[in-house]
Amino acid sequence: MTDLHSLESDLLAQVEGAADEAALEGVRVAALGKKGAVSELLKTLGSLSPEERRERGPLINGLRDRVQGAILARRETLAEAALAARLSAERIDVTLPVREGPETRGRVHPITQVIDEITAIFGDMGFAVAEGPDIETDELNFTALNFPEGHPAREMHDTFFLPPGRDGTRKLLRTHTSPVQVRTMRSQQPPIRVICPGRTYRHDSDQTHTPMFHQVEGLVIDRTATLAHLKWILEEFCKAFFEVESVKMRFRPSFFPFTEPSAEVDIQCSRKGGEIRFGEGDDWLEILGCGMVHPNVLRQCGLDPDEVQGFAWGMGIDRIAMLKYGMPDLRPFFEADVRWLDHYGFRPLDIPSLVGGLTG
């Protein structure tokens, strides 16, 4: 009969002497594998008498458990030694000279920069920033904004509609950031001064239009808000944004369902050699739409048009970015071309402010 004590001493010595994981695995197979020494002993238990089995069984099982424990402990020791060796080999010599940094660094996208510029300008006037979801209800995007049934903007060819829900209602990708104004008027009491930047979506794609574009709208609700206040705000914005000392503006009558009266705003500019300059010249360029908030919109938001009034405006962020920084095509804004971004992008620390300058 096998001497269990001698076998255990021999196996534990082999485990301790295993220099690497492969050698340790060989010891494990020789001891505990299907035909290993300990496994063969366990097979003999079936041929023993009950008395011998009760005496021999615990001894063999104990041997198996101790060998297994020794193998696990040795495996952990080998793993720790391997890790220590790898860390030692990969140690960084901090006395070596550093490598030169990359020639190019990340750039802030022009859209992000222009949004920050707009926020800085209106923030200086006391405006807060309001945001809302890109997916909106038909009620918030159209009905609450005085769009009548059958209006062209409600048609599939102009708006991205989502499949109807179980209750039959359908949601859509907002066509403007005006729903944020509705949410603000329903959740806050006047006086209200907010700007609403964000993504908007329409079926349109060419050199100056994309299916997704960026828009910023402004809203003022108060007891005494007038068109004169609107004109002053827009004039101050244009001077600050285009960084000119003065700018002439003209308001042309227009129509928007959510404002009455409504106007489109042109600013003075010159066009020479393919370059547009603002604050000079005898030409005009349209940049935004505006008007007094329609009484029906105020009612939809729970406000009394006999008690409060207000004005709103909206402009395309992508468009004014193109105008200010001389970008001829809108499509590269969304093409992730690193060369284009290196040319038109901004340094990360060029944070716009009216004190330090919008463009650094």
Curated annotation (Swiss-Prot):
Cofactor note: Binds 2 magnesium ions per tetramer.
Places the protein is found: Cytoplasm
Coiled coil: none
Any GO molecular function: phenylalanine-tRNA ligase activity
Annotated keywords: Aminoacyl-tRNA synthetase, ATP-binding, Cytoplasm, Ligase, Magnesium, Metal-binding, Nucleotide-binding, Protein biosynthesis
Catalytically driven reaction(s): tRNA(Phe) + L-phenylalanine + ATP = L-phenylalanyl-tRNA(Phe) + AMP + diphosphate + H(+)
UniProt cross-references to Pfam families, sorted A to Z: Phe_tRNA-synt_N, tRNA-synt_2d
EC number assigned by the record: 6.1.1.20
Keyword Metal-binding: yes
Transmembrane segments: none
Source domain of life: Bacteria
GO biological process terms, semicolon-separated: phenylalanyl-tRNA aminoacylation
Cofactor section: Mg(2+)
Binding of Mg(2+), residues: E260
UniProt entry tagged with the keyword Cytoplasm: yes
Record-linked PANTHER family: PHENYLALANINE--TRNA LIGASE, MITOCHONDRIAL, PHENYLALANYL-TRNA SYNTHETASE
Record's subunit section: Tetramer of two alpha and two beta subunits.
UniProt similarity note: Belongs to the class-II aminoacyl-tRNA synthetase family. Phe-tRNA synthetase alpha subunit type 1 subfamily.
NCBIfam families: pheS (TIGR00468)
Protein name: Phenylalanine--tRNA ligase alpha subunit
Gene it is expressed from: pheS
